[in-house]
Amino acid sequence: MDTLLKLKKVNLKYQTDKDTIKVLNNIDLTTKKKDTISIMGESGSGKTSLIMLIGGLEKATSGKIFFRDQDITSLSEDEVSEIRRKHIGIVFQSFYLIPNYTAVENVALTLELNKLKNPQQQAKELLDRFGLKNRFNNLPSQLSGGEQQRVAIARAIAMKPDLILADEPTGNLDSKNSVMI
């Protein structure tokens, strides 16, 4: 079996002054390469928290998360960051585009960090596929919400990652662009 991701009894709790808030409770999940999975639930049900855990941006209270058969819950932040940089693309609900970088620069940065050839050209080709050819040199503040979302998606998939985590990936897109993505 080509297991890409495995969660075993993953729990996430937050402690406030008065309460313990259980966000995720004994989550078990196994995915294979090329699987497409949707996690659906009410607002506040833990979907974003699950993405943050899988992406190594937050630590589980307990349980294990394996990515490509490696227990990422036992790794240092730097080691998890390296895995994320090379193998995981994340589309956040808030796009987190770099405000003083153009659309091309926001996408090319991922490619540059991974020392790929022609990052600017690759970024332009990807953005062109997403209908943003006339927006290459625009800053995020000069883009609509839907355009920013397409830049964020292009950035997440630029490295052709093994795993793409997307939090409401088409939330700001019209129906035509949702289908295109």
Question: What residue spans do the PLM features occupy?
Answer:
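ABC family nucleotide-binding domain
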Residues: L4-L5, V10-I181
